[in-house]
């Protein structure tokens, strides 16, 4: 076996026949598998022990040699080597074919590699390979040309005609193609193609470029083209295609065995036919069948009908073993099932600390079993492991005491599926609980998106000290207070906790005991406990100064607010403490937003440990006082406004008027429909306003909605106002609204109308989940190798950050676009000229506020889009790590975080395509499909026309269309012919910028790239993606979207190659292109020219440098075909390829620079310590064993230092 951490790269190539024989331990000659009587493998069959090794450890087939002492002996009787049976997983065999056959990947792929190399069409190739036509190999003196196809009849005619011409040769089948491939002189071919390439144009040029790429690939990789035709095929080890006995004596076997048997049977039959000199036609048929059998083995179903097994099920071929969700890559290599794990239902744990979880005793015992056994032996409760095991199995009382001690400081990981972002797995300290359910802290539910209606969670146990350290320092819930997507607290209290906080900070006049004055908080608490005052009573209490200067003052507030402030830091900056050191920090009614702000301020000021304490305080206060408040809702809380009837009648009158105007022919049906919908929408608003003003402030329903605990104005409207407009099955708004509410009850017709929406809602949600998951998978794949690799790349590129607007609506302000980024240059105060922030310094909240207050509209900042790093990005271009609020560390896997941050809210985005006014027209895509459309750089539905020059607009109306003419300042004119259906959004005489849309709709990103260049398209994608997310109230930081765009724009299309050696027309890596050009300019040569290319995320994932990553993503066979011809080397730079081969990922603590850390130590002190340990160890044999290990480690360290 190959040691997995010792190799730097992995290469893939074509296997030559010699190579295949070299791998093999013997030839498989018979199709037999195992003997039906003895159940032992047949000799020379597919499971032969002589070839593949013994089926039982250290035991030969005939039984002459048993036991390990004969290791390495080959039995002279049966020929089996005495060794471990594990070798049956790694030893390969081979089959010598009687005739060459082609490899279907290289013949059938698109484009056909064999076809490109030979300059033959795939159809012609197929005819030759499957014995339908002859191909001329050497025309000799005939009037034929090389590679010409002949039918059997023609071939016979030519043979008769040129009997004496000895040179004339034509053949059929793979041997003919093999001969043609052997005749190719690659260098000569390359020279000829390069010459013809320069002079050709159009389709011909594209074809030549493709052929050039294949020829170049073969030259570079030193692969021989004739290896695409196989004389010998490998047989994979038997334990990878096992045969197992089921109860009832039948056998289950891997499909591969069937496919191999077909090949061997046909091969043996062909050998026999050749030996006895059968007629050509029979031999030919057998050769074709052999070719088809090998095709089915390699890729069943690629050509013709797939070979089927029992029940017409297509057999799984070698290619099927690799591709798709259940293939080798995605099923076994990228994610595996692990031991030391368990799962159970979750219940709420309101008494847990923020960093704790409740672990059922039985589960904990099973998970920590090895640790418990070790401890039992160590404490001499049990004398050996066997006894200790029995104690654990019997659940002896002593076991629980040991378990209690062991779980201290040993964090466990909790995971809830689906894990949409990194907060789906967090570490907690376990607390043993009775019962079988895991207890979860209520505040981490938001991050997990968990509720307690029967959700299950999985527990994993980190074993090694390193894993435990990472779990504690990086994954503990206290380190995950902020969400990585926007840097805001994700542990915000919800529901009961919000309600409790809101209730206890409510202020009411005229409550029991109002105006009482207390000497301190304790006296007030005593009064409250004895019911002299209520929570909402306004009282006065003497408070000490926050600045601890010994002064105090009487402060007025409510009892509840005094209690609430006890656990809250009193210097968060909500009160100016220089002027007022006595007031309460939070002297207002606390709703959900306010709680979030308090947590955010505490985190920025005190860090996570103090914040975790605060969270636990808010949690316990919230639960306690929402229980005391006992707020519930009843039918009586829903009051229907008296004015509702009048408002609806008024709307109906206006609609009758619109209907009359329509019937007179003054407006179109579409305009009538729009107007009706508008009238109803206004009516709904009026009813809602009447309802909400009618609701008293202390109405329980109102309290729940206003505080943010549960429900919204929208839901109250449906309960007490009117349900409003509904949509039909196609998603169009029905023009008759539901005027009743749930309090009054719906009529049959209203109920029927409302069912459309409900059913659509459910089916949309199901579809959305799948689409969102697939989008996340593609995003992860495209960005997985973006890791912070250096501190500063010293780039000279920047982006100009300004607020994002959509028409007049602000999508994102300047402040939120620059917080956490590094300034590209000194930013100056426009009035005084003093420097607000220096170049390469981070802009924090305070600086951003200052920049905005000074009226600065745009700022030059560093961005990942301008980072110079070839692999990954640098910390200065990335800026702040949103999850910690500090500068990002080297080794952070920011690509994956970006993908998760964009993908995780995907499920919240709507699926709806909004139709303009409900009449079926060209819909403008929104929601999730719009995000997908942008990231895949597709041509959008409802395409807008854009202007390619800056200038003034003139509109001319024609019979069939409108002409929009844009005239630039220097007199250049461009005419855009716009069909009547399109809605023009510019007016006569408007000034338009380059790339501005002239009509409604979405713009094709490729057009923006052409007109406004790379910067224009970057801004457009960021603006559009943010528009979709902000509409749903989801905040995502720009830098996540920028990372994806960086990957989409990582390639350049070469126009003129100059002295670079690039092929013009080919697509190359942007950073390679830049480096090559810089080098050429240094040497005084001609640099290459090219344009940025914008790829969709799927295409960008497949265009990655790493073939392992691409193959495990999609189109596995295509990727492997291409890369094996190129002889590609995967340098294992990204995360995915390292996961696949089982190395530590090059991110976090696995990054290469941490490998070389050396420990400085004072040799003498260490040696003394070891001596002391050794002395003590002589008393205790177990400790002795441990200390020798320690000293062994030190010695090896010293060797390294030397």
From Swiss-Prot:
Cofactor(s) needed by this chain: Mg(2+); Zn(2+)
Catalytically driven reaction(s): RNA(n) + a ribonucleoside 5'-triphosphate = RNA(n+1) + diphosphate
Binding site for Zn(2+) 2: 793, 867, 874, 877
Keyword Zinc: yes
GO biological process terms on file: DNA-templated transcription
GO cellular component, one term: DNA-directed RNA polymerase complex
A Pfam family that the UniProt record links to this protein: RNA_pol_Rpb1_3
Entries under HAMAP family matching the protein: RNApol_bact_RpoC
Self-association state and partner proteins as the record states: The RNAP catalytic core consists of 2 alpha, 1 beta, 1 beta' and 1 omega subunit. When a sigma factor is associated with the core the holoenzyme is formed, which can initiate transcription.
Family statement: Belongs to the RNA polymerase beta' chain family.
Protein name in the entry: DNA-directed RNA polymerase subunit beta'
Organism: Finegoldia magna (strain ATCC 29328 / DSM 20472 / WAL 2508) (Peptostreptococcus magnus)
């Amino acid at each position: 076996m190959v040691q997995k951490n010792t190799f730097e790269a992995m290469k893939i190539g074509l296997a030559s026949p010699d190579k295949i024989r070299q791998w093999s331990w013997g030839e498989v000659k018979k199709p037999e598998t195992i003997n039906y009587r003895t159940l032992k493998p047949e000799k020379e069959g597919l499971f032969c022990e002589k070839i593949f090794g013994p089926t039982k450890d250290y035991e030969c087939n005939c039984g002459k040699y048993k036991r390990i002492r004969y290791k390495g002996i080959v039995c002279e009787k049966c020929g089996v080597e005495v060794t471990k049976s594990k070798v049956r997983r790694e030893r390969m065999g081979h089959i010598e074919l009687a005739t060459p056959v082609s490899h279907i990947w290289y013949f059938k792929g698109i484009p056909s590699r064999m076809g490109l190399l030979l300059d033959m069409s795939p159809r012609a190739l197929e005819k030759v390979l499957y014995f339908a036509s002859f191909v001329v190999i050497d025309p000799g003196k005939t009037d034929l040309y090389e590679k010409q196809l002949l039918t059997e009849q023609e071939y016979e005619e030519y043979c008769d005609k040129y009997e004496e011409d000895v040179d004339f040769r034509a053949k059929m089948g793979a041997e003919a193609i093999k001969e043609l491939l052997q005749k190719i002189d690659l260098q000569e071919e390359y020279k000829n193609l390069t010459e013809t390439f320069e002079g050709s144009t159009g389709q011909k040029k594209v074809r030549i470029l493709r052929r050039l790429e294949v020829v170049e690939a073969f030259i570079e990789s030193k692969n021989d083209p004739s290896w695409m035709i196989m004389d010998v095929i490998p047989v994979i080890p038997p334990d990878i295609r096992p045969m197992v006995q089921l109860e009832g004596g039948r056998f289950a076997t891997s499909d591969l065995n069937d496919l191999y048997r077909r090949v061997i049977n046909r091969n043996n039959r062909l050998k026999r036919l050749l030996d006895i000199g059968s007629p050509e036609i029979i031999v030919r048929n057998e050769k074709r069948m052999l070719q088809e059998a090998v095709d089915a083995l390699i890729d069943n179903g690629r050509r013709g009908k797939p070979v089927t097994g029992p029940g017409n099920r297509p057999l799984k071929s070698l290619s099927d073993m690799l591709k798709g969700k259940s293939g080798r890559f995605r099923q076994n290599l990228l994610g595996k099932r692990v031991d030391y794990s368990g799962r159970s239902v979750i219940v709420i744990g309101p008494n847990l600390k923020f960093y704790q979880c409740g672990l059922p005793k039985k589960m904990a015992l099973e998970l920590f079993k090895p640790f418990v056994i070790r401890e039992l032996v160590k404490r001499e409760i049990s004398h050996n492991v066997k006894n200790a095991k029995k104690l654990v199995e019997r659940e002896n009382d002593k076991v629980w005491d040991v378990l209690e001690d062991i779980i201290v400081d040993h964090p466990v990981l909790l995971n809830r599926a689906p894990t949409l972002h990194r907060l789906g797995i967090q570490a907690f300290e376990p607390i043993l609980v009775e019962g079988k359910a895991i207890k979860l802290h209520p505040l981490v539910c938001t991050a997990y998106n968990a509720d307690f209606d029967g959700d299950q969670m999985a527990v994993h146990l980190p074993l090694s000290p390193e894993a435990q350290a990472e779990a504690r320092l990086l994954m503990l819930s206290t380190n995950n207070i902020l969400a990585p997507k926007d840097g805001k607290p994700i542990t915000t209290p919800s529901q009961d906790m919000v309600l409790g906080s809101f209730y206890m900070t409510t202020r009411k006049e005229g409550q029991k005991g109002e105006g009482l004055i207390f000497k301190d908080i304790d006296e007030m608490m005593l009064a409250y406990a004895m019911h002299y005052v209520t929570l909402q009573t306004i009282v006065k209490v003497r408070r000490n100064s926050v600045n601890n200067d010994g002064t105090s003052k009487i402060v007025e507030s409510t009892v509840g607010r005094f209690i609430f402030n006890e656990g809250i830091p009193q210097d968060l900056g909500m009160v100016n403490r220089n002027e007022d050191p006595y007031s309460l920090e939070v002297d207002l009614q606390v709703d959900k937003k306010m709680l979030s702000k308090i947590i955010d301020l505490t985190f920025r000021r005190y860090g996570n440990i103090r914040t975790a304490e605060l969270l636990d305080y808010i949690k316990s206060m919230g639960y306690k006082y929402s229980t005391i408040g006992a707020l519930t809702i009843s039918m009586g809380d829903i009051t229907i406004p008296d004015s509702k009837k009048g408002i609806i009648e008024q709307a109906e009158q206006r609609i009758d008027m619109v209907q009359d105007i329509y019937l007179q022919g003054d407006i179109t049906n579409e305009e009538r429909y729009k107007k009706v919908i508008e009238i109803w929408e206004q009516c709904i608003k009026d009813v809602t306003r009447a309802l909400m003003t009618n609701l008293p402030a202390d109405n329980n329903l109102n309290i729940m909605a206003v505080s943010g605990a549960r429900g919204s104005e929208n839901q109250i409207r449906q309960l007490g106002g009117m349900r409003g407009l509904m949509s039909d099955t196609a998603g169009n708004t029905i023009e008759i609204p539901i005027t009743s509410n749930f309090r009054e009850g719906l009529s049959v017709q209203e109920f029927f109308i409302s069912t459309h929406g409900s059913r659509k809602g459910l089916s949309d949600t199901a579809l959305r989940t799948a689409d969102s998951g697939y989008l996340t998978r593609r995003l992860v794949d495209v960005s997985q190798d973006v890791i912070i690799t250096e501190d500063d790349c010293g780039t000279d590129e920047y982006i100009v950050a300004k607020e994002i607007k959509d028409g007049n609506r602000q999508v994102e302000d300047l402040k939120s676009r620059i917080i956490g980024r590094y300034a590209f240059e000194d930013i100056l105060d426009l009035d005084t000229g003093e420097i607000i922030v220096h170049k390469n310094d981070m802009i924090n909240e305070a600086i951003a506020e200052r920049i905005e207050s000074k009226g600065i509209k745009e700022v030059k900042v560093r961005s990942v889009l301008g980072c110079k790093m070839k692999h990954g990005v640098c910390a200065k271009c990335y800026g702040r790590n949103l999850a910690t609020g500090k500068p990002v560390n080297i080794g952070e896997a920011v690509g994956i975080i970006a993908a998760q941050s964009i993908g995780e809210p995907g499920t919240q985005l709507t699926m709806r395509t909004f139709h303009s006014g409900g009449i079926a027209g060209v819909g403008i895509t929104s929601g999730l499909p719009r995000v997908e459309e942008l990231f895949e750089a597709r041509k959008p539905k409802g395409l807008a026309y854009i202007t390619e020059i800056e200038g003034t607009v003139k509109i001319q109306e024609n019979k069939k269309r409108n002409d929009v003419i844009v005239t630039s300042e220097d007199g250049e004119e461009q005419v855009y012919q716009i069909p009547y259906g399109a809605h023009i959004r510019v007016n006569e005489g408007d000034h338009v910028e380059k790339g501005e849309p002239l009509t409604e709709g979405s713009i094709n990103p490729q057009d923006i790239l052409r007109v406004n260049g790379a910067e224009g398209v970057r801004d457009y994608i960021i603006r559009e993606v943010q528009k979709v997310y902000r509409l749903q109230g989801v905040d995502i930081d720009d830098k996540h979207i920028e990372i994806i765009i960086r990957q989409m724009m990582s390639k350049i299309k070469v126009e003129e190659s100059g002295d670079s050696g690039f092929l013009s027309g080919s697509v190359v890596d942007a950073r390679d292109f830049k480096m090559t050009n810089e080098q050429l300019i240094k040497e005084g040569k001609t640099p290459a020219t090219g344009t940025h290319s914008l790829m969709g995320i799927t295409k960008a994932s497949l265009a990655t440098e790493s073939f392992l990553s691409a193959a495990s993503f999609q189109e596995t066979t295509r990727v492997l075909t291409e890369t094996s011809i190129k002889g590609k080397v995967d340098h294992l730079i990204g995360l995915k390829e390292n996961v696949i081969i089982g190395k530590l990922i090059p991110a976090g603590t696995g990054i290469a620079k941490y490998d070389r850390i050396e420990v400085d130590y004072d040799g003498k002190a260490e040696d003394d310590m070891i001596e002391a340990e050794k002395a003590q160890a002589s008393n205790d044999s177990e400790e002795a064993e441990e200390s020798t290990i320690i000293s062994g480690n030190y010695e090896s360290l010293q060797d390294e230092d030397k």
